[in-house]
């Protein structure tokens, strides 16, 4: 196969390949950018594989950065955008089920491609658009299926994260995992325990925000991988229910987390524990506590003016999206109108400050904050106008 019209990202990177080839080495575009171009999807960056060793690459270009020199990766900066260029390599055993114990640089493209995870990712492309397909990846793209390169048992024993990548790709691409690969995932599922949670988290979120999350979640359940995701063990029924309800991907990572925590029926403290086990940031935990609480309210009815104010517009939309997936009526227009009609949308918009109240005779201290909080509530709920004289009078009279 030869692609006639290459995306701009490839065109801009052509001089890099040409420079390497003119020096007598091989160089190809590889990986997801090749796959996605064939599928007609947008690409964002390109990766280059070459027979040139890192030191040889550094002699060919004026500006380079060692981004992963021990694995043969050098960033080339000569042509504006940085291009990651990695030497063809073969890999030894993987005693930690994630990273090879030893990397050996080789001159063979075939040796390099056979160590990759799936056939659809083991495609290479020359700078003129000619696709090199040594493992029938083009056929698997045509049939919309995910197949491990070579022996799937070996691929997943080498790197257990590949199993999560498989279910992620099933969702992102709306592809089916072939039976032999799926069976190997089932027999190796327990190895997911060996993988850092942060790595698993990335794949889970990509699954939940993909175009076909039902496919990815079904594979997660079928293979047993779900059991080795933090705090999923007691929620098989909840996951099965969510799988049946989630017809399209979550719009954001926060929505994805909200779907899980709401489906699992988690309250504030349990959400903290759950998300800490998933190694999420404190800011994410706070946001998900709010969106989950509001999604639970929306599943039971509407939100009060005060709840709308507390949540904020962006988080309201996340809570509504999650609630709709789980069976609630879509209240997005109603919620936006409620938000826009609030007397104030932030505490800073309150017509009085602590200084104003102290000048009116209120003593400083904890009670001052409590008074301001009460005034904020009264204004938001329409019991007091957001006018300085009225608010001062409400405190001093």
UniProtKB/Swiss-Prot annotation:
Residues bound to Mg(2+): 45, 47
Cofactor(s) in the UniProt record: Mg(2+)
Keyword Chloroplast recorded: no
Enzyme class (EC, first level): transferase
A single GO molecular function term of this UniProt record: tRNA binding
GO biological process: RNA repair; tRNA 3'-terminal CCA addition
CDD domains to which the protein is assigned, alphabetical: NT_ClassII-CCAase
One Pfam family from the record: tRNA_NucTran2_2
UniProt: ATP binding residues: 32, 35, 116, 159, 162, 165, 168
Domain of life: Bacteria
Residues annotated as binding CTP: 32, 35, 116, 159, 162, 165, 168
E.C. number: 2.7.7.72
InterPro entries named among the record's database cross-references: Bact_CCA-adding_enz_type3_sf, CCA-adding_enz_C, CCA-adding_enz_firmicutes, NT_sf, PolA_pol_head_dom, PolyA_RNA-bd
Keywords: ATP-binding, Magnesium, Metal-binding, Nucleotide-binding, Nucleotidyltransferase, RNA repair, RNA-binding, Transferase, tRNA processing
Catalytic activity reported: a tRNA precursor + 2 CTP + ATP = a tRNA with a 3' CCA end + 3 diphosphate; a tRNA with a 3' CCA end + 2 CTP + ATP = a tRNA with a 3' CCACCA end + 3 diphosphate
Note, other: A single active site specifically recognizes both ATP and CTP and is responsible for their addition.
Its biological purpose: Catalyzes the addition and repair of the essential 3'-terminal CCA sequence in tRNAs without using a nucleic acid template. Adds these three nucleotides in the order of C, C, and A to the tRNA nucleotide-73, using CTP and ATP as substrates and producing inorganic pyrophosphate. tRNA 3'-terminal CCA addition is required both for tRNA processing and repair. Also involved in tRNA surveillance by mediating tandem CCA addition to generate a CCACCA at the 3' terminus of unstable tRNAs. While stable tRNAs receive only 3'-terminal CCA, unstable tRNAs are marked with CCACCA and rapidly degraded.
Subunit structure: Homodimer.
Protein family membership: Belongs to the tRNA nucleotidyltransferase/poly(A) polymerase family. Bacterial CCA-adding enzyme type 3 subfamily.
Full protein name: CCA-adding enzyme
Species classification: Bacteria, Bacillati, Bacillota, Bacilli, Lactobacillales
